Amino acid sequence: MSEEADHNRAIFCSSLSGNDPMKHFCALVLALSAASFSANALAAQPLLSPAELQAKLSDANVRVIDIRDPKSYAANHIPGAVNAPYGTWRGPANNPGELPGLPKLTTLVQSLGLTPSIHAVVVSSGADATDFGASARVYWTLKVLGLKELSVLNGGVRAWTTAGLPQNNTAVQVAASSFQPQIDKSLVATKEELVARVKSGDAALIDARPADFFKGDTRHVAASVPGTLQGAVNVEHDKWFAPGTSTFVSTDQAQKVAASSPIDPAKETVSFCNTGHWAATNWFAMSEVLGQKNVKLYAGSMVEWSKDPNGLPMANVPSRPKQLLIDAKFWAEKTFK
């Protein structure tokens, strides 16, 4: 609703007598309109430029979460940022994409002083497009926990530094919160759910990995079998960035990327990769930037899927001799590195 329309409605309502039945209706419409405007005005943008973030640093309700390693954080960081390294948001070594349990995540977000009223801004190094996946994965995790006021610093610390904005090396500690999150299952695709989806073919399965993974020419070191989900299409995670950077493109450009990709916004969509990292970028693009309402992330992704003892359906699985060659390559890299 436009401000002009609201103004005209207000004039009409004020012209009604106090006992006119329309008076109450008008008041209700105006209140709902104001609430809608207020919610839209307060809603956090999914992406913030360095200048936009700098303008918010004096706000006590803004919490900058630096997910780089402790050494990088200690050297220099955005003033006021707290450190929560990316690894603390991830699963175990044998299934790093696994969403940690609620008790662990509760302790983590409470230690950062997060509550629904805090605007959390996730910051990674900004090294490249792959690095953006870390910010997107933490953003997704926070949203899964019920937090709504969320943003990612577009371009990360590299963009902040390039902009010549201030940094310091003062470690920041914040008061813990008592926030008790709950898992929003509408954002999470489980392996069990995906088994049914693959069988029925009623969901769009988007593989965010580079083409050599999708085609089965290689695999993640923790995966058992190369290949992809049966029925999946490939939308590489780095399509959403200015070439050679971790700077996410404009919404208009993102719409063009989506239009040229095998993305069907009318279908429920599941984003996956090896460990739910690159997939988080595609989820972020579709759900948060483009506003698609029916996008889930399969956190365990191909590492979890390929290890299932029941041998779940896969496509682009190479021949046994080719798999042995891939295994030999991993062995050589590990042995002679």
Regions inferred by a protein language model and the residue ranges of each:
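Intrinsic-disorder-associated, low-complexity terminal segments enriched in Asp/Asn/His/Tyr and depleted
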Residues: 6-8, 20
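Rhodanese-like catalytic fold shared by cysteine-dependent sulfurtransferases
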Residues: 41-63, 70-204, 208-337
